[in-house]
Amino acid sequence: MQVTVETLEGLERRLNITVPAANIEDAVTAELRNIAKNRRFDGFRKGKVPLKMVAKMYGKAVRQDVLGEVMQRHFIEAIVKEKINPAGAPTFAPVENKEGADLVFTATFEVYPEVELKGLENITVEKPLTEVKEADVEEMIETLRKQQATWVEVEEAAEAGKRVSIDFVGSIDGEEFEGGKAENFPLEMGAGRMIPGFEDGIAGKTAGMEFDIDVTFPEDYHAENLKGKAAKFAIKVNKVEARELPELNDEFVAKFGVAEGGVDALKAEVRKNMERELKQAVKTRIKEQAIEGLVKENEIDVPAALIEQEIHVLRQQAAQRFGGNPEAAAQLPRELFEEQAKRRVVVGLLLGEVIKSEELKADDEKVKALIEEMATAYEDPSEVIAYYEQNEQMMNNMRNVALEEQAIDAIIAKAQVTEKEVGFNELLNQQPAA
């Protein structure tokens, strides 16, 4: 086998491979003999058919199969010999493919970029310093009460925090438009669900009042025919309601699965959940900054093949979230996922180089701690821990998580780290949307 390597544009490489004719002919003959030995042919005892007859019947098909197998096998031998690391499947193209002559073919593919980490000392990370305070717990309890609240009709004016039931009819230039009409429509004032000016026009009104308001649809409104249009809404307020919060008692507490200990037990459980959430938020915020700095300091070429693989993964995940099927996923435009896919590949390559350069291996104690921490969110942590320990795939997933965290720790160790005190809500509101 003869091999030459061409460097094309960017990460693309081409191998020119020559395979001696004897190798091809020997492989074709061996396969034809295998067919002659194992298949039945009319007029011949099994295994006694002449090889020339088998070659006449199956020669072309066998040769094509052999060429495919030979190209794949010699490609693998060539990349091992040349110490090349492909980033995706190759494209084969025969150059010379005559019977009795050497096979000459090319294999074109992308390679992984050579990454040399730099600038880790320039990365800046602001570590949040925060804790769950009593006021944070009380605020969360109030949020839970609001979630369990009921609405009661009141003889008061509509204002933020109240809910109104309204009839409305919208029109543009005197003509009603589709979707602009509703009866007994519930609208929570201050929630910002409607277009600008709509809630303002209702504020201060009481049940039984009928009136018109003038509004303008935003330029970025989702309905193309309404973008930027001036509209008039005829509105009738049917009723105004106020939120009635449940009392903070044992009955309320029981709704959250707290059987004993009353309000104090609920507060303790809420605090525990908030502290777990806070710990994860701090970890996420630090990781986010470390990765952002790593990407900023290290621009690398990205193999298109890896981006395509990641786009495929993101498509499948999107289809699963919306209850779709694999065929539907393939129809989703690649542009929806391209930027995120490229980012994932870049981060993966850079973190992989951190792991390699720091010679990191998943720490067993860290893996154990991560599983135990995750298990605390479940009713029976010991059952969850046992499940992980008995499932090798789940353990491997957790080892990968641990290894990534160790890579982040390695980046932080070389970065410029400062600390800043922040409140619980402030920190959680900084978390990016998933």
Curated annotation (Swiss-Prot):
It comes from the Bacteria. Its EC number is 5.2.1.8. It catalyses: [protein]-peptidylproline (omega=180) = [protein]-peptidylproline (omega=0). GO terms for molecular function: peptidyl-prolyl cis-trans isomerase activity; protein folding chaperone; ribosome binding. Pfam families: FKBP_C, Trigger_C, Trigger_N. GO terms for cellular component: cytoplasm. Residues 161-246 form the PPIase FKBP-type domain. GO terms for biological process: 'de novo' cotranslational protein folding; cell division; chaperone-mediated protein folding; protein transport; protein unfolding. Keywords: Cell cycle, Cell division, Chaperone, Cytoplasm, Isomerase, Rotamase. Disulfide bonds: none annotated. Its main location: cytoplasm. It is found in: Cytoplasm. Belongs to the FKBP-type PPIase family. Tig subfamily. Consists of 3 domains; the N-terminus binds the ribosome, the middle domain has PPIase activity, while the C-terminus has intrinsic chaperone activity on its own. PANTHER family: TRIGGER FACTOR CHAPERONE AND PEPTIDYL-PROLYL CIS/TRANS ISOMERASE (PTHR30560), TRIGGER FACTOR-LIKE PROTEIN TIG, CHLOROPLASTIC (PTHR30560:SF3). Involved in protein export. Acts as a chaperone by maintaining the newly synthesized protein in an open conformation. Functions as a peptidyl-prolyl cis-trans isomerase. This is Trigger factor. The gene is tig.
